[in-house]
Structures are given as C-alpha cells and as structure tokens.
Amino acid sequence: MIHKTDVQIRFNDIDILGHVNNAVYQYYFDLARVNYFTDILGEHEADFHAEALIVASIKVDYIMPVFLKDKIYVTTKITSIGNKSLTMIQEVFDGKQLLKATSETRMVAYSIKKQSTISIPERWKTLISSFEKDVVFKYLLDS
C-alpha cells in the first residue's frame, strides 16, 4: 500500500530558475515521512521522545522540475526492515501523475535516553507490516 501526502508549494520554495529549489525537496520528504509515521504508528508512538527513527542516509534523484503552480504529492513506502534499520522510498508526483523526484532513505532506530542505536521495536514492525503488506524483513533473510 502507498501512503500519500499532499504538499503545498510556497513562493519561497522557488529559486531564480523558476522551479522548486533542490534543497526544498527534503522538506517535502520530511513532511511526508512525519505524516507516514503519525498515520501508521499513531500519534503516541510517532512522538519519538523515548525511541526514534533517525535518518542515516538519503539519496535523492531529481527527475523533472516542479513549478509554483504545480499540484504535487509525495508517496511514502517502507520497502524493507532490518534489525536496527529500515529503508523508505518516497516519490514526488504532480497532478498529472508525472514523477518529479525520488528519495531512498535509510533510517536507524535510536534510544534518546541511551543515545545509541537499538533494535526496531516489535510493535513498530507489526504496525508497519500491517500497512505495508509486501515489506521485506531483512533480518529474517539473514537467519
């Protein structure tokens, strides 16, 4: 299943070339990521005060420019879950379903109190896998 977040393009997102600046896409991905975790894990779990998912790496590909008057949305999907990390794929589309940009993010489970990585809580894996029917559990493949 795909999670969708509508994004409002703001005037200050636009650069001198008349399109959304490449740095602004990360705000769009962040907004969609927060919405995903709030919707899938629930507000209590997604407050991330004790346990969190932090970004370890991001790869963004810019496919086509986005302009001020475009109507865009971001799709978010977790494709794999390991013991301590997960992989998230996000895509920006316009109203005509044209792919504008993609992002692959690896996130790591983290204990705020211990200031160290932890295993992804089982309750998170359960909630994510109930939404993402085809998520791959990498740690099961390694066994």
What do the PLM-derived regions correspond to, one by one?
Residues 1-73, 81-143:
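Terminal targeting signals and extreme-terminal segments of soluble enzymes
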